[in-house]
Amino acid sequence: MARLTAEFGDRIYYNQVMDRGAMRQLIGRLIIYLGSNCTSQILDQLKTLGFRHATQAGISLGVDDLITTPSKTWLIRDAEYQAYTSEEQYRRGSIHAVEKLRHVVETWHTTSEYLKREMTSHFRITDPLNPVHIMSFSGARGNVSQVHQLVGMRGLMANPQGNIIDLPIQSNLREGLSLTEYIISCYGARKGVVDTAVRTADAGYLTRRLVEVVQHVVIRNPDCETNQGIRLHSIRDRKTTRDAGGNSLLSLQERLIGRVLARNVFLGKRCIAIKNQDLAPDLVNSLVNFPKALLSPGSEGGHCEILVRSPLTCKSMPRACQKCYGWDLSCGNLVEIGAAIGIVAGQSIGEPGTQLTLRTFHTGGVFTGGVAEHVRAPFNGIVHFSISSSTHKTKTIQPTRNRHGRPAWTCPEAFSVIIEDRIGKKKVLNVPQYSLLLVKNHQYVQSRQIIAEVRASIAPLKEKIEKNIYSHLQGEVFYNPIGLRASCLKQRHFLHFLCSASRMNLWIEFASIRSYLSPLVEKTSYIWIFSGRLNKFFNATLNLSFFYQTQDYIQRDLPIGIQNHVFNYSKVFLLSIYNRQRSVTFSVSRRDIRLGRKKKFTDYIPLSRISTDKIFSKHTGSIHTISEQNEWILTLSFVDQFSKKMFSSVQTPGTSKVSEKSEEQIIDFQEQLILNYPLSKTTIFLKEPSILAKNYSIAEKDSCIGLLGEFFIFLNELSIVSVRTFISTSQINLFLKKNVFSLLCITHGNTFKGKEKIFFINDSKNIYNIKNWLISVNFLIWCHFSNRILNKNQTLATIFLSNRSLRNEKDLQVKEFKIGQSICPSRDLGEKIFEPFTHSILPESGHLLSLNEGNLLIRLAKLYLIPTGGIAHTFHKQTINEGDTLVTLAYERLKASDIIQGLPKAEQLLEARVGNQVVINLYMRFEILVARIKEQLRNYIGSLTQMDLMLSQISVNRASKALEYSQLETVDQVQKVYLSQGVYISDKHFEVIVRQMSSKIAIVENTDFTAFSPKAVIRTAFPYDVLGVFFPGEILDISKAQKMNRVLYKPLPCKPVLLGITQASLNANSFLSEASFERTITVLSRSALQGRMDWLKGLKENVLLSKMIPAGTGLKQAPVLLSPNGTGTLFSNNEQNIFQKKNVTSLSKSKGQKVQIRKIFSFQKSPQRLSFLYQETSSSNIRRKIQPTVCLCKPFITKRNWLHISLKQLTEQSLNYETKKFCLQELTNNFIPRKKENIFYLKKKTIKTT
């Protein structure tokens, strides 16, 4: 022992578990410090050592090692109870089908994930050396999901379409599956086989498209000498409100390794890293871990972000340079010149998708993902809590309706919940901010009951789909009155109010009025009523105000006010017809009701938005009058019967469609309330898109309309009316043309059947004894009400007093059966109306037809709840068959998070499809933020004033920032898709792809409003423009546009485009590359008509023609041109004829051998096409190679040994379209303008000879 201690005493000993991550770090450091040869030998020895120890250890796996978690029993029981509760609520009509499906899926998903966490902790505590636990958590074989299926529960399965089956598999593979569970589990096996076959082809096609778009990108030069760069940051999970930062998926250190600095980094006044220095791991750790305060503002200005060079900012378009690309990740050094980085980038992104498609076979198609956490009660007790902020202003919880259709409350901030049992034991539970509270204060809860739902730290993947609800019966459709509708339209903080006995405006100014429009469904939603104060104008007298207190919470089924007035309408009904409006003749019977002594009431009649579901007449009539004898009189004009096509199209608010020669008129309701313009065929109605949400169903029986949500029951009288409604407060906001039409309608939120048959049998006047307990249906609370008398200047204040809970006394409810009412199934009819029905259970839901002393006649029915936004496909009293579509619901559902759903998301990002929400946001930001992209494309050369230079520099900086943001956001989004699967791909590969996607601009017309017109355009001295060179819609490279704008008087009208990888491949500079990719016939036909030429600069074009590819050793340096007479000029010609034959020589230096290249330009008079001969002669080789190629001419004029060209002469030449384009491109590539002269001078190129 002493010998061993002496031998190894001076060596460092590491005690660390060598898992997958540690091995990756070890191999990386070995390659950097020792090289690949030594690393391979060391890894071979490690492999031998691992096999020997694995043989000696002899870990085995048996059936007894599969231990089931004890908490599975009560978790399954709780999930089954919640699923049963959702099914019962769906049968009663309390929730709709989407809420039921969502609740069942999320309940089982939450149970499965919770059981997985319990399984992990159970293994760690009871048996940490369990072979199953060791194998799965060491990374040797298996993962947590597979072990969970063995000893936990298989959970929810996903079908081949990725949809989640709502029937879970409760058993695990250790216990064995039932027949139904086995059939469902076969979905997963089939899904794995199908994905292996089909999805692999999809991933391979993605690789082909990626390689196609960047196959020509090659490292061409060492440095492009750019001063631009990008700032990187760590990539985190999807952010939520509770966890603003999220978990780090990719650290900043990993993203910086192998990059090159674009700017010096200073620590104080000392430079610690210089520009163009590559970042090794040690230097990256030092830079990132420096405190922010020590970094000088000149470098990174208090940021942790380092400015590094990137292919996105490289000036060597369309190639790249060594400095901007950085390290070759295979060797840890700068990439070599000639490396085909485009091919490497395409394969690096596409190949992991091909390999990851095999993962679904091993997981068996089991659905996994992040879930919301629950705060449960530890024992039985009473809940106590209070919410208050640090600013001593009480923040009340806001009532809402959760995703499962149950009442909940949103918590504005984090707070504590105290649970106290009978003996005084207390437990404090912390509820995070913006959680959903599912219990009320001072409520009794049971053990393990869910108190609050905490939002998931990682938002699960969701998708928006539509679900059709089909009829389970054959029969007739009846729509209950479409709920309550409370709306308050904010318009200049005023509401139009029609005063009584006069046609003038009385305005109600609100101190705090909010825009609010929410359809309310009975027993499932809530209403807010706002308060305000009255301002009197024109000495108008108004004694009472029907406005409640600010934000008083009012439950749906509670009585709100009692008044003694009933209006009996006879034969009032409405037929809703799409695109046609039919009105019928009806009459209104008046009934004068005395309201009290010396009191005046005003009916609240707001202005209603005109839509097609209202009753229109040819002329508007009187609306509302009140006499002076303290009586209430309601009058309506008679409506003649007519049927006319009112409008031809449904338009959104703010637009109008009119006939020709019509002038726009705006109705000012403050000056004139009633306009008697007749209707005509050209009248267009301003219609909101949601048609079905505004259809008010009016029954064909005698109806009564109540005011402002009243609930009153008259006993021992001939009429018993129950009215619970609120009056709509929407307003007219019209912009009509030509024939202006206005209508003020008396609108109501709901109508109720008020015949004498309510609570009567065959018009009998006997009334049965009805208990007068008024109980809320929503929360089952005994409530006693005390109503204050309305004085002159007081607002109505209804006080709600709750005494005790009725949790165990659910049978004592309001006797609310009446003729024509729909009854939910499984309701106890005991002590409802008649004694013979005591303790009778209704087996099925139905429609109550008649009440007799001995029996009830119920028509079998099925209840369906339609939420907001649902699209109904049937009408009231329509006969349908079984299986017909009733309604279509749009909702979000969870989506499986494997690579099968990840690859389509990455493909949507790379293809820049508009259907993807992320791409929409990026594209909108790309167009909005790059509002002045034209300044970036233009190189300002000429006489600049100081102000012009400052303005142009600001525009260029702004456009550059916007373009950089859009590119980096796309890179991060695609990176997150692969990081979610545990695959890290270097950022530089994504940047090469994204650069090609965003390197194009589209030519637009000058009259296009999307074209960019910079404020500080630098005008050159040329008065001529090159017209007809580019057509609108033509795609150009940004680099070409930059060069063209140098010689144009007016910059090209263009806008940036974000092309997908397929479109970018089809808009390449090589028609051979385009034709060999897709749409061969289309590309070749278009190229032949345009006379395109291929310069064979990419890899694919040379491979097609069996030439040496311009990469690696086949990359040639660009030749340096010299003049034949050695005077430093390329051409020396004093003749004015631009079409002539001229021999030009140039010199190239390659591999130490001087090769003389002779280019012969053969010009003809006014040619359309020219022949181009390329002769290569060598001093060491007498052979000559002559290769004919088709190209176009370069027209030029020489004068005084300087080459210049007149744009006027170019535009007047009889050249075709492609020739003009070529001439313009070649001019901008070789010439620069001289200040204040109509001459373009040649770029002088010198060569150093030894």
Curated annotation (Swiss-Prot):
Its EC number is 2.7.7.6. One of its GO terms (molecular function) is DNA-directed RNA polymerase activity. SUPFAM superfamilies: beta and beta-prime subunits of DNA dependent RNA-polymerase. Keywords: Chloroplast, DNA-directed RNA polymerase, Metal-binding, Nucleotidyltransferase, Plastid, Transcription, Transferase, Zinc. Zn(2+) binds at residues 224, 314, 321, 324. InterPro entries: DNA-dir_RpoC2_beta_pp (IPR012756), RNA_pol_Rpb1_3_sf (IPR042102), RNA_pol_Rpb1_4 (IPR007083), RNA_pol_Rpb1_5 (IPR007081), Rpb1_funnel_sf (IPR038120). The keyword Metal-binding applies. GO terms for cellular component: chloroplast; DNA-directed RNA polymerase complex; mitochondrion. The keyword Plastid applies. It is found in: Plastid, Chloroplast. Binds 1 Zn(2+) ion per subunit. It catalyses: RNA(n) + a ribonucleoside 5'-triphosphate = RNA(n+1) + diphosphate. In plastids the minimal PEP RNA polymerase catalytic core is composed of four subunits: alpha, beta, beta', and beta''. When a (nuclear-encoded) sigma factor is associated with the core the holoenzyme is formed, which can initiate transcription. DNA-dependent RNA polymerase catalyzes the transcription of DNA into RNA using the four ribonucleoside triphosphates as substrates. Belongs to the RNA polymerase beta' chain family. RpoC2 subfamily. This is DNA-directed RNA polymerase subunit beta''. The lineage of its organism: Eukaryota, Viridiplantae, Streptophyta, Zygnematophyceae, Zygnematophycidae.
